[in-house]
Design a protein with these regions (language model features):
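N-terminal membrane topogenesis motif
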Residues: 1-22, 77, 81, 208-227, ...
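Interhelical loop/hinge segments that connect adjacent transmembrane helices in multipass membrane
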Residues: 1-4, 169, 173-179, 191-235, ...
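Signature of the first transmembrane helix
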Residues: 3-64, 91, 95-99, 124-125, ...
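Helix-loop junctions and terminal segments of transmembrane helices
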Residues: 27, 56-71, 140, 200, ...
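Interfacial segments at transmembrane-helix termini and the short loops linking adjacent helices
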Residues: 102-121, 313-343
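Membrane-proximal transmembrane or re-entrant/amphipathic helices at the cytosolic face
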Residues: 419-471
Length: 471
């Protein structure tokens, strides 16, 4: 457990260093491309993110659950190899379907710039699909940090170099875009080489495969695939609908603002990368005492860091956004609402992993489907009226409320947030007294959140001990 905590800390530092690099890149990127071009990239990546579901079809959950159960290294390597072959076959099918419906997509957006670049989705999809498949394979072997560094840090370092070159040589958007895709491809090659070195097997072992085993994987995979699809749609539908209703410029501003709000989400991503494979192993071995300890500790750590970041964004999100340009300051509420939604999500600790890798995995699909319906409905209602603020409200509301206790936690967070706004409105400048006052209130918020999560964890872990088992 200590080793995993160390890996989680390293992964979190990698993530936040990457966020810093990303903010620097975003700041300079606004000097070489317009908000409309940023919106174009966001829409291309959003469409790719939806298509990637059909390519991977639940492989993430399948690999974590079933590779962790295999004892033989040759069997694990064989399982990984078969997953890559299956993924590539699905990729070819998805590309054919995408080409068939390309005209419908272009008709929906009616944008000449998108028409010029839409076919770039094909190589982007291949690169992202292979990278994610390699990443999840390494996670199953508890080797997540290298993939995180490549995905989050190296690509941003190379991107920063590209931006400097673009500023110096005054590169066109087309050359900048092609160069960026080339950086993603280089990153993928490095990761695949690392995967080959770390998961080298002497021979393939297919002895674990049977018709019953295949049916079990297919049954589990279908539910997790649809759950993953719903999750992807939930995370992408806001950008897609903003692009069509508000325009590419609005999508560009929303994309910049959402980067800040999702900083809290990086905490949960680290938990998924590092601890979910362990959750799968502990459930398989029925090691509930270890699950209990992990559940309590992770929940506290997530809220401790998350609440600090949330408070910071409440006060300084507007100032941070104004760095990118006057128009971007309109994304203040996007940052705050998304940060609040992610903070609530962090409070659920490893609930998602426990549900997904237990016999109650169907619950994951049902809840995500309901949340998707809620998200799309609210987007249709709120975006025309409130623009990007309406989109983020719909997205924040649809972030997984895994348990009923979170409703109580949300109420307390909202009460605390109200006090913060009242205080902020009465402090004209941030002098030493104001900073001291904010620091004291921040300390009270931290203590309160930790108390609430401790109470909730005690209640929930008793339920998990009685109900959760591995199948």
């Amino acid at each position: 457990m200590h080793n995993l905590k160390k890996k989680a800390f390293i992964n979190l530092m990698i993530s936040y260093f990457a966020i810093f690099l990303g903010m620097v890149n975003t700041l300079f990127r606004t000097q070489i491309i317009t908000a409309e071009q940023i919106g174009l990239i966001a829409i291309l990546m959003s469409i790719t993110g939806i298509l990637i579901f059909f390519v991977q079809s639940g492989f993430n959950a399948i690999i974590i659950k079933y590779v962790c159960k295999l004892k033989n290294r040759s069997q694990k390597g064989t399982f990984i190899f078969l997953s890559f072959i299956s993924m590539l076959c699905l990729y070819l099918i998805v590309i054919l379907v995408f080409i068939f419906f390309k005209k419908n997509i272009l008709k929906y957006y009616q944008n000449e710039m998108l028409e010029k670049y839409i076919m770039w989705i094909i190589p982007i999809l291949l690169i992202n699909s292979l990278f994610r498949q390699a990443d999840i394979s390494l996670r199953a072997f508890f080797l997540a940090n290298v993939a995180s560094f490549l995905k989050l840090n190296l690509v941003r370092i190379l991107h920063f170099g590209l931006i400097i070159i673009a500023l110096t040589l005054n590169l066109s958007f087309e050359k900048y875009f092609v160069s960026y895709i080339s950086i993603l491809a280089i990153n993928l090659v490095i990761l695949l080489v690392y995967l080959k070195v770390k998961i080298t097997i002497r021979h393939f072992d297919f002895s674990f495969i049977s018709l019953k085993y295949f049916k079990e994987i297919l049954h589990y995979g279908l539910f997790m695939a649809f759950g993953s699809f719903v999750n992807i749609i939930t995370n992408r539908v806001d950008k897609l609908m903003i692009g069509s209703i508000v325009g590419l410029s609005g999508a560009g501003i929303y994309t910049i603002a959402i980067l800040f709000g999702n900083i809290l989400g990086k905490i949960g991503e680290v938990v998924v990368k590092i601890f979910h494979p362990k959750v799968s192993v502990d459930l398989s071995n029925r090691n509930f005492s270890e699950l209990e300890k992990d559940y309590k500790d992770i929940g506290r750590y997530q809220l401790l860091l998350g609440s600090f970041l949330f408070i910071f964004f409440v006060f300084f999100a507007g100032e941070l956004l104004s760095i990118f340009g006057k128009n971007y300051k309109s994304g203040y509420w996007v940052v705050v609402c998304m940060a609040l939604g992610q903070l609530i999500n962090n409070a659920t600790s490893i609930c998602g992993g426990i549900i997904s890798y237990s016999k109650y995995f169907k619950f994951d699909f049902y809840t995500k489907f309901l949340l998707l319906f809620l998200n799309i409905s609210m987007n249709f209602i709120l975006i025309p009226k409130y623009g990007i603020n309406g989109a983020v409200i719909a997205t924040a509301v649809s972030i997984h409320p895994w348990d009923s206790y979170i409703i109580k936690l949300l109420f307390n967070i909202l009460c605390m947030t109200t006090y913060f706004f009242l205080i902020k409105s009465n402090i004209q400048d941030f002098n030493l007294l104001g900073i001291g006052l904010l620091g004291f209130i921040g300390f009270i918020v931290h203590i309160s959140l930790l108390y609430f999560t401790k109470y909730f964890n005690e209640k929930e872990i008793d339920y998990f001990k009685k109900k959760v088992s591995f199948k």
